[in-house]
Regions:
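N-terminal alpha/beta PP-like core and its mobile active-site loop of ThDP/TPP-dependent enzymes
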Residues: 1-245, 249
Length: 251
């Protein structure tokens, strides 16, 4: 669910790692077992590296899709003295979408007749930007389960958190431009193997893997959803009236 969680845990002492000696709570490779659930997992093998490992974890929270980070400390490292000092923490910026890709997205949105906005969990911290884009673009909106509440249920252009609905899926197939912001469009939102999206798809996501997975976009914008939605809102022509009667019909 894109939640930043810092997990600090112990592992057997360095001489015992991977030896299968039957130590208490021994796992042959704890770091690898945890890795698929995390942004990264790391075994800190030197007490002097502890502070830098923590700094790297918080840098990941700031610049990537928020996900858990696991730092494991061998018992002998945890007990060792360390000259920590001040860790080096780079203030890396989040990814920035290419200007040419933003231009292409603006052109598609301005030329759309039936635009549709899908907002996911990656927009929960930029609800104002999502609503401003919706209002100016004249699109209808669908929220995923994780994005529920970003667009108020009372908003006349909000179809709702209803990708399970056949009526919603039908409208998704009718949309000529679909803007998917901060969403994986995962199976658990629709319970279909693959949604039918014949229109031009614009994806906005902070995670490069998610951006290209399952639904390759006509335009992929690798960036923070709030920043991109704000820029698109500033640049699109607007003036299109949302088909709120259709949204009410689908609801």
């Amino acid at each position: 669910d894109s939640i930043p969680v810092l997990v600090l845990c112990t592992v057997n002492a360095k001489p015992d790692l991977g030896k299968g000696r039957g130590r208490l709570h021994e796992i042959s490779d704890q770091r690898t077992a945890i890795a698929p659930l995390t942004a990264f997992s790391r075994t800190v093998m030197d007490a002097n590296e502890m502070a830098q490992a923590l700094a790297d974890a918080f840098a990941a929270f700031e610049t990537q899709r928020p996900r858990p980070v696991v730092l494991e400390y061998p018992l002998d490292v945890l007990a060792a003295p360390a000259d920590i000092g001040h860790p080096k923490r780079e203030r890396a910026a989040r990814p920035q979408a290419k200007p040419a890709d933003i231009d292409a997205a603006v052109k598609l949105i301005d030329g759309a007749e039936r635009p549709l906005l899908i907002v996911g969990g990656g927009t929960v911290d930029c609800a104002d930007q999502a609503r401003a884009f919706l209002d100016k673009s004249g699109a209808l909106a669908i929220t995923t389960t994780a994005g529920k509440g970003v667009i108020p249920a009372s908003h006349p252009a909000n179809i709702g958190s209803s990708l399970l609905s056949k009526a919603t899926q039908k409208y998704l197939a009718e949309a000529d431009v679909v803007i998917a912001a901060g969403t994986e469009m995962a199976e658990t939102d629709s319970w279909v193997d693959r949604l039918d999206i014949p229109g031009k798809l614009i994806r906005i996501d902070l995670d490069a893997f998610t951006l290209a997975r399952d639904y390759p976009p006509a335009v992929g914008l690798l960036a923070d959803a709030g920043r991109i939605l704000a820029e698109l809102t500033a640049r699109i022509r607007g003036g299109r009236k949302p088909v709120t009667a259709r949204a009410a019909e689908i609801r």
